[in-house]
Regions:
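Juxtamembrane transition segments at transmembrane-helix termini in multipass membrane proteins
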Residues: 2-10, 17, 27-28, 32-38, ...
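Membrane-helix interface motif
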Residues: 43-55, 155-170
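Alpha-helical membrane-spanning segments of integral membrane proteins, especially the hydrophobic core
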Residues: 84-99, 126-152, 176-187
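Membrane-helix boundary elements
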Residues: 99, 103, 171-196, 202
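Loop-to-transmembrane-helix entry motif
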Residues: 15-23, 27, 134-141, 145, ...
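Membrane-interfacial helix-loop-helix connectors in multipass membrane proteins
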Residues: 161-186, 251-260
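Hydrophobic transmembrane alpha-helix segments characteristic of membrane transport
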Residues: 105-135
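Membrane-embedded or membrane-proximal helical elements that form or frame transporter/channel pores
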Residues: 67-104
Length: 304
């Protein structure tokens, strides 16, 4: 007998309380991401020259702090002229940062899901679980995320009608074209929301079941079809928690942003991962850890 939604939330929270170290992958993710961006930034500054880099930030600060209209425009042109010889370097460094961050985030995401699985299944987890699952599944998880990204890009077809009417958009009679563009954007956003919702659990399934990317996506789709309400409820629930915590904590003067980030890394993200892992494991009748000292007698039959 699978757990009900409320029970999944309750038990997931209990698992988190007993395994606060599940925050480790998210902490390391943040630290390594910052370190990586810093290393690339220093490398770029070394290539283009530290004096040029200092001038870039000085002019950028002038633009951001100036209240007038004329000065920012002048400084903006000056800034563009300053970076023009280094456009290729900047584009290359940007691509390196994007690819590097994608790998770092995916590595620790696989580790976090693996830790959540171990904690849900055995009642405890540790650094070894994170490394084992991360090394084993990082490549497959990267490919899965890329495939889902491609599915999202397919929605660009909704903008094709507006593209065909592009001459009208820039003419004096572009009302119909603008309306088509707005409708296309709306349909694309709707399509992306649907794809994200349907395939949201696929990365978790890949790590839990040790599947290949295509199989993980197929299984994720099948799981959504069988458990639509639970998936949608958990998605709304976790997104609402993230938004509310950011709004409430982020509104604290001066330190709100820092505290909000800290809470997200230490509490919200680990809890969210545990809930999604437990949802799949509970609904597919996977073995779940039972704390016999704290659990109700009925839990033994419900969770095993």
């Amino acid at each position: 007998m699978s757990e009900e939604f409320g029970r999944i939330i309750e038990k997931g929270f209990e698992t988190w309380k007993n395994n606060l170290n599940i925050a480790l992958p998210f902490i390391l993710d943040s630290l390594f991401s910052i370190l990586f961006v810093g290393i690339v930034g220093v490398a770029v500054a070394f290539v283009i020259g530290f004096d040029t880099t200092a001038q870039f930030f000085d002019r950028l600060q002038i633009i951001s702090m100036s209240e007038g209209q004329e000065m920012p425009a002048v400084e903006a042109v000056s800034l563009l002229l300053l970076i023009k010889p280094y456009v290729v370097h900047l584009i290359l460094s940007f691509l390196i940062i994007i690819i590097g961050l994608f790998i770092i985030i995916t590595f620790f995401e696989a580790g976090a899901i693996g830790m959540a699985k171990a904690a849900t299944e055995k009642g405890g987890t540790g650094f070894a679980d994170m490394m084992n699952y991360a090394k084993k599944h990082v490549i497959s998880l990267l490919l899965t995320e890329l495939l889902i990204g491609l599915f999202l890009l397919v929605g660009i077809v909704f903008l094709l009608p507006a593209a065909l009417l592009s001459p009208e958009l820039f003419s004096g009679q572009g009302g119909y074209g603008v309306g088509t563009l707005i409708l296309g954007i709306f349909l694309w956003i709707t399509y992306m929301v649907i794809v994200i919702t349907v395939l949201f659990i696929a990365p978790y399934i890949l790590v839990i079941e040790s599947l290949h990317p295509i199989d993980a996506i197929k299984t994720g789709f099948g799981f959504f079809v069988s458990h639509k309400l639970d998936v949608i409820l958990l998605l709304i629930f976790t997104v609402a928690i993230a938004i509310v915590s950011n709004l409430v904590i982020g509104s604290v003067p001066k330190v709100g942003g820092f505290i909000s980030t800290f809470v997200s890394i230490i509490i919200v993200q680990p809890l969210t991962t545990l809930w999604w892992v437990r949802l799949y494991m509970a609904k597919t009748n996977k073995p779940l850890y039972v704390n016999e000292l704290l659990s109700h007698p009925d839990d033994l039959s419900n969770e095993w």
